[in-house]
UniProtKB/Swiss-Prot annotation:
Subcellular location: Cytoplasm
Catalytic activity entry: [protein]-peptidylproline (omega=180) = [protein]-peptidylproline (omega=0)
UniProt source species: Legionella pneumophila (strain Lens)
GO terms assigned for molecular function: peptidyl-prolyl cis-trans isomerase activity; protein folding chaperone; ribosome binding
InterPro entries from the UniProt entry: PPIase_dom_sf, PPIase_FKBP_dom, Trig_fac, Trigger_fac_C, Trigger_fac_C_sf, Trigger_fac_ribosome-bd_bac, Trigger_fac_ribosome-bd_sf, Trigger_fact/SurA_dom_sf
UniProt free text on domains: Consists of 3 domains; the N-terminus binds the ribosome, the middle domain has PPIase activity, while the C-terminus has intrinsic chaperone activity on its own.
Upper lineage: Bacteria, Pseudomonadati, Pseudomonadota, Gammaproteobacteria, Legionellales
GO cellular component, as recorded: cytoplasm
Protein name: Trigger factor
All copies of domain PPIase FKBP-type, residue ranges: 161-246
NCBIfam families per record: tig
Function (record text): Involved in protein export. Acts as a chaperone by maintaining the newly synthesized protein in an open conformation. Functions as a peptidyl-prolyl cis-trans isomerase.
GO annotation, biological process: 'de novo' cotranslational protein folding; cell division; chaperone-mediated protein folding; protein transport; protein unfolding
Length: 443
């Protein structure tokens, strides 16, 4: 067998394999002889079919079969000998074997990039730190009170904070548009759940008195046919309700499964939950910052095949989020634009390649104690922690998920050792609600 390797553009390689005709003909003849011993053809007894008859009828199909299997065996051998690791499935051609000629084929594919990890070498990395304040707990209590308001009907004009039940119909250029109408729709005025101007336009309205309001859809609105356009909504208020905040007493605490200690126990429970979620978010953000820093000093050529594969995964994820279920094998995924996923796919591929090399270089292995500690941390948030522990330990797949998270933490810790760390204080809202929060000054 002869093998040649040609370097094409970037990571692309072209491997040419030539198998001697003697080996090909020997394999084809062997299979035809075996076939002759068991094939059934009208007019001949089983096993008594003349070889030339078998050859004339089955030679082409046997050659195709030999070609496919020879590609599998010889290409694997060629890749091993030349230390080539394909990043995607090779494109092979041709697969035909001509009698009396060497079987020659080419395989074109991208190889996995070979690179050495560059360390940070005390490069500065800014991480964040945060804690739950008394004010944060009080704000959460107020949100819970808002969510548990007692609503009663009123007859006064609508004011901010009221809940209304409305019928509405939207128009573009005096024509109704799809998805622009509803009946019996509940809306808290000031909640910001509708497009800008819609809720403000209802303030001052009264029951059964028609309203016409003009609003403009945001330029970045999800439906392109509505984005940036002015619409008119005809609204009828069917009901107006005023909310009353519940008192901060034991009855309120009991709504959140607090049996003893009243509001103080509720605050303690809320603080613990907030602190747990804050710690998780801060750790995640700091991990990302450390990974981004390592990627910034490690420029890796990315195989297009891996990017394409990751884009397909992201498309599947989006389909799942949009439609709430996995698509069936015969169900066509909508043709989402590639540019929606390309940057994220490139980042994932870059990080995945770098992560694997970093783990190999530093011989990082998931620590069993850390795996068990992470499971204990997850379990502590549940009413029946032992059940959750048993759930993880009952499946290799479940344990592998935890091990992967532990590996991420261990890699991040190792990267941090080689960096010059600075810390920035951020308040709770800045971390948990980045679009709403504000940064605190300080180191």
């Amino acid at each position: 067998m002869q093998v040649s390797v040609e370097t094409l553009e970037g990571l692309e390689r072209k491997v040419t394999v030539s198998v001697p005709t003697e080996k090909v003909e020997e394999e084809v003849s062997s299979r035809l002889r075996n076939l002759a011993r068991k094939v059934k053809i009208d007019g001949f007894r089983p096993g008594k079919v003349p070889f030339n008859v078998v050859k004339s009828r089955f030679s082409d199909s046997v050659r195709e079969e030999v070609a496919r299997e020879m590609v599998q065996s010889t290409l694997y051998e060629a890749l091993q000998k030349n230390e080539l690791v394909p990043a995607g499935y090779p494109h092979v051609e041709p697969l035909e074997i001509e009698p009396g000629k060497d079987f020659k084929y080419t395989a074109v594919f991208e190889v996995m990039p070979v690179f050495e990890v560059v360390e940070l070498n005390q490069a500065p990395v800014e991480l964040i730190q945060s804690e739950v304040s008394d004010k944060d707990v009080d704000n959460m209590i107020e949100k819970l009170r808002e969510q548990n308001k007692e609503w009663h009907e009123v007859t006064h004009a609508v004011k901010k904070g009221d809940k209304v039940v409305i019928d509405f119909q939207g128009f573009l250029d005096d024509k109704p548009f799809q998805g622009g109408s509803a009946e019996g729709y509940e809306l808290v005025i000031g909640s910001g759940s509708m497009i800008p101007g819609f809720e403000d336009g209802i303030i001052g309205g009264k029951i059964d008195k028609p309203l016409d309001i003009k609003v403009s859809f945001p330029e970045d609105y999800g439906h392109k046919d509505l984005a940036g356009k002015e619409a008119t909504f005809k609204i009828t208020i069917k009901k107006i309700m005023e909310g009353k905040l519940p008192a901060l007493d034991e009855a309120f605490a009991e709504k959140f499964n607090i049996k003893e200690g009243g509001i103080e126990s509720l605050k303690k429970d809320i603080r613990e939950n907030m602190a747990r979620e804050l710690e998780r978010r801060v750790n995640m953000m700091n991990r990302e910052k450390l990974f981004d820093s390592l990627m910034s000093v490690n420029h890796v050529e990315l195989p297009i095949a891996l990017i394409d594969k990751e884009i397909e995964h992201l498309k599947h994820d989006m389909y799942h989020r949009l439609f709430g279920h996995e698509h069936k094998d015969d169900e066509k995924i909508p043709d989402f634009p590639r540019e929606l996923f390309e940057e994220q796919a490139k980042r994932r591929v870059h990080l995945g390649l770098l992560f694997a090399e970093y783990v190999k270089k530093h011989e990082i292995v998931a620590d069993n104690d850390k795996v068990n500690a992470m499971i204990d941390k997850f379990a502590s948030a549940y009413e029946s922690p032992d059940e959750l522990r048993a759930w993880y330990q009952s499946s290799k797949e479940h344990m592998a998920e935890v091990e992967a998270l532990v590996m991420e933490d261990m890699v991040a810790d190792k990267i941090a050792e080689d960096a010059k760390l600075k810390y920035k204080n951020m308040d709770y809202d800045s971390v948990m609600n980045p679009k709403k929060g504000t940064e605190k000054k300080g180191e």
